[in-house]
Amino acid sequence: MERRLGVRAWVKENRGSFQPPVCNKLMHQEQLKVMFIGGPNTRKDYHIEEGEEVFYQLEGDMVLRVLEQGKHRDVVIRQGEIFLLPARVPHSPQRFANTVGLVVERRRLETELDGLRYYVGDTMDVLFEKWFYCKDLGTQLAPIIQEFFSSEQYRTGKPIPDQLLKEPPFPLSTRSIMEPMSLDAWLDSHHRELQAGTPLSLFGDTYETQVIAYGQGSSEGLRQNVDVWLWQLEGSSVVTMGGRRLSLAPDDSLLVLAGTSYAWERTQGSVALSVTQDPACKKPLG
């Protein structure tokens, strides 16, 4: 059954889970995987997936190392900033002590594989890689990382060609990666439009991820094949579904499960986000 969760209250209650060696805890694990991650946790491995990831830094800063168009790059995501990582971009999160970040990703399709790679220094040469169907990244990564640290490749720093795929399951993205942006500053700059009742997309329509900001007004969520995560940032709103009315106060969140219709009434001064990730909207390779 759907229930409200205060984001910061939930983080406070689960703060012990954000320390090493676990460093993360799932708030939701349905079609959408909504998780919060702490640190310190520095990594050498790069994760690759066919879906996108939303990052938001609740407390402190983080660094997301990525491979962008054949080059290594550090993306600094500061406290209060939001960022969308495109699909098929190798990425390696670097998190520090006393930080907490939100990450939203989706359940994988049965045809999709995730990859874990180590590169030779700052080159694009693959040192070690494993491809797998991802059910639970939190439990599946550790054995692969342990395998790497016990491997000949780790000891010698040289790849074993026979253990690398001649053709990966999919090509890496060639998209340019956007800069993180302050969520508060973006909302402030669009305050008039939001309070006039105009929903606005933070990242446009060229991604399968939709992060929509809503001000006062009403809307109906038709029955969808994907989950919808709602996060009330300011003011209040009421979500009605299945004959139940759920009031959302500032910082409350609600996961509307796939296949559920709902009505959403937002009061004057309300500001809220809606997050969806629909693999049916996957864009052509690029």
UniProtKB/Swiss-Prot annotation:
Superkingdom in the source lineage: Eukaryota
Enzyme class: oxidoreductase
InterPro entries reported in the protein's UniProt record: 3hydroanth_dOase, 3hydroanth_dOase_met, RmlC-like_jellyroll, RmlC_Cupin_sf
Cofactor(s) recorded in Swiss-Prot or TrEMBL: Fe(2+)
Keyword terms of this UniProt record: Cytoplasm, Dioxygenase, Disease variant, Iron, Metal-binding, Oxidoreductase, Pyridine nucleotide biosynthesis
Amino acids binding substrate: 53, 95, 105
Region (Domain A (catalytic)) residue spans: 1-160
E.C. no: 1.13.11.6
Pfam name, any one: 3-HAO
UniProt region (Linker), positions on chain: 161-177
Catalytic reactions on record: 3-hydroxyanthranilate + O2 = (2Z,4Z)-2-amino-3-carboxymuconate 6-semialdehyde
GO terms assigned for molecular function: 3-hydroxyanthranilate 3,4-dioxygenase activity; electron transfer activity; ferrous iron binding
Binding site for O2: 43
Residues binding Fe cation, per UniProt: 47, 53, 91
Signal sequence residues: none
Region feature Domain B, mapped onto this chain: 178-286
Metabolic or biological pathway, per its Swiss-Prot or TrEMBL entry: Cofactor biosynthesis; NAD(+) biosynthesis; quinolinate from L-kynurenine: step 3/3
Disease: Vertebral, cardiac, renal, and limb defects syndrome 1: An autosomal recessive congenital malformation syndrome characterized by vertebral segmentation abnormalities, congenital cardiac defects, renal defects, and distal mild limb defects.
Family statement: Belongs to the 3-HAO family.
NCBIfam families listed in its UniProt record: anthran_nbaC
Quaternary state and interactors: Monomer.
Full protein name: 3-hydroxyanthranilate 3,4-dioxygenase
Lineage, highest ranks first: Eukaryota, Metazoa, Chordata, Craniata, Vertebrata
